[in-house]
A protein has these predicted regions:
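C-terminal substrate-recognition/cap domain of FAD-linked oxidoreductases
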Residues: 3-11, 235, 241-323
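Acidic/histidine-enriched ion/cofactor-binding microenvironments in catalytic or ligand-binding pockets
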Residues: 41, 150-152, 162, 311-314
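FAD-binding subdomain of flavoenzyme oxidoreductases
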Residues: 79-89, 99-279
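Conserved hydrophobic/aromatic beta-strand scaffold that supports enzyme active sites
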Residues: 26, 71, 157, 258-260, ...
């Protein structure tokens, strides 16, 4: 429990660099089990609770807006497993999974998957600094989302503390091991436990049409915070505090090539290529598009991009695809 100036100042802002107020206190629980009691104490003291992981977010979710706030930093919740083959509800065959607490850095899960010959699909550019809890709260994704979706699509289950300082466990049923919007109905089991996490108080089942999780022509809809009432995901910590999760990991195809495509001329003529390339590769039965990253001319100038073409000028756009 930290009241010192350094701890409070270092929790004033996140990657946004916005500053409004210093938090009253910073809490760094040692174990997942401590979370519910900390939330209960903050509620009793009428402190606004701000969950924080790596602080890499660009939406200001970890920025205190009032002095009467408590930042709960999950950085010490670092327990995780190697790849484990588990039987998931509704599936006949065991599935490769990785368990991780909320404070585990994203890249560590990716490394654990790679050691066993698998791939962790949630790969934001902040993977070296962001944490698992934030990935769930933001429904994070990266270039592999083209093939396997965002955090929501790759979760087998997750655990969180509710605003009532009680425990909630959410489990995906009949997981399709792919993008959630490809299924007609996505089902989840919600189990509500008391403050000790041992006594089951009630349970319910959510059956949500898969199409509601994506916006037609857009994909992930960042404006949809309610997300059909599914707890924790994409809520930015507003409906509870994520403490741990179990992820599905995937096998990469045997052969992978990274292709760099440079586009010159008018950018408006090049942009439709993104959709055309995606549609073309999705129509091929033996080929998968594992990722597609778009870099515009401003980004290319900023990173000092070295043109592969002999034209001698910077491209208007570069696409990097994993095929």
């Amino acid at each position: 429990i930290k009241f010192d100036g350094l701890s409070r100042v270092s929790h004033v802002t996140d990657a946004t660099d916005w500053r409004v107020e210093m938090p009253f206190v910073v809490l760094t629980p040692d174990t997942e089990a401590e979370m519910a009691a900390l939330v209960a104490g903050c509620v009793e003291l009428e402190l606004t609770i701000i969950p924080r992981g790596g602080g890499t977010g660009y939406t200001g979710g970890a920025v205190p807006l009032t002095w009467k706030s408590a930042v709960i930093n999950t950085e010490k919740l670092e327990a995780m497993s190697e790849v484990e083959m588990l039987s998931l509800p509704g599936l006949a065959q065991p599935v490769a999974t990785v368990f991780s607490e909320a404070g585990v850095v994203t890249q560590r899960v990716a490394d654990a998957a790679e050691r066993a010959g698998y791939v962790f699909a949630v790969d934001p550019t902040s993977a070296e600094a962001s944490c698992i809890g934030g990935n769930i709260a933001m429904n994070a994704g990266g270039k592999k989302a083209v093939l396997w979706g965002t955090a929501l699509d790759n979760l087998a289950s997750w655990k969180m503390v509710t605003p009532e300082a009680k425990w909630l466990e959410v489990t995906r049923l009949d997981h399709n091991l792919g993008k959630i919007h490809d299924v007609e109905v996505a089902s989840f089991e919600l189990k509500y436990f008391d403050a000790t996490g041992k006594k089951l108080e009630r349970s319910e089942r959510l059956d949500i049409p898969g199409s509601t999780f994506r916006k037609e022509g857009l994909g992930k809809d960042v404006t949809d915070k309610f997300l059909a009432g599914l707890p924790g995901i994409q809520k930015e910590g507003c409906d509870g505090l994520i403490t741990s999760a179990r992820w599905i990991v995937h096998r990469m195809p045997k052969h992978v090539r990274t292709v760099c495509m440079e586009f010159f001329g008018n950018a408006k003529d090049a942009v439709p290529s993104i959709v055309e390339i995606k549609d073309y590769l999705f129509s091929q039965s033996q080929v998968k598009l594992a990722g597609l990253e778009h870099l515009d001319d401003r980004y290319l100038k900023a990173v000092g991009y070295a043109t592969k073409s002999k034209r001698g000028t910077l491209p208007k756009m570069v696409l990097v695809g994993d095929i």
